[in-house]
Regions:
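Short, acidic/charged, Gly/Pro-enriched secondary-structure junctions
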Residues: 87-115
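Helix-start/capping segments and mature chain N-termini
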Residues: 1-79, 86-93, 117-161
Length: 161
């Protein structure tokens, strides 16, 4: 279902599932996958910025994102997930195949696939979806903030997080 005339989804040539490039409409996750049923997943949102002068796309802190992604999967006790070097290659292949020449957003996900209960740790699948997303207006115009005098509740009093 299209919601607007220039839907960014229309510019996606391929997505990546478990290292394989494929059209968006061919990428499927089972409704029985714990990643869907129990939110047994982790994700990273990664930005890449197009430089018109150099005709190049620049990824923002990719290595740091990948370390955080792997740490998140370890925290959830996922087993047998791909090395960050493999995921990095997959991201670069995805960007090359889509051939974006504008600012983009990359959504990297790792999730428990197939079938199982909440506590299963495998099989781990990954997906990479990249699509155009312009910089926020505040990037050029700036933003105003106020520093509050309120103190946050202690986590032991009433865990708000």
């Amino acid at each position: 279902m299209k919601t607007e005339l220039n839907n960014p989804r229309d510019k996606i040539k391929v997505v990546t599932m478990n290292g394989s490039l494929m059209p968006l409409n061919k990428a499927k996750v089972s409704v029985t996958a714990p990643g869907l049923s129990y939110a047994a997943l982790v994700f990273e949102g990664i930005r890449a910025y197009w430089n018109d002068k150099l005709n190049e796309l620049y990824l923002f802190r990719l290595d740091e994102h990948l370390v955080r992604f792997a740490n998140s999967m370890r925290l959830l006790k996922f087993s047998d997930f791909p090395e960050t070097s493999i995921i990095k290659e997959d991201i670069l292949k995805n960007l090359k195949a889509n051939n974006y020449q504008e600012d983009i957003y990359i959504r990297l996900q790792g999730y428990i696939d197939d079938w199982g209960e909440m506590a299963v740790q495998t099989p781990v699948s990954t997906s990479i979806v990249s699509y155009p997303r312009p910089r926020a207006v505040a990037f050029k115009e700036g933003k105003n903030f106020t520093v509050s005098s309120w103190k946050r509740l202690d986590d032991n009093a009433s865990p708000p997080r």
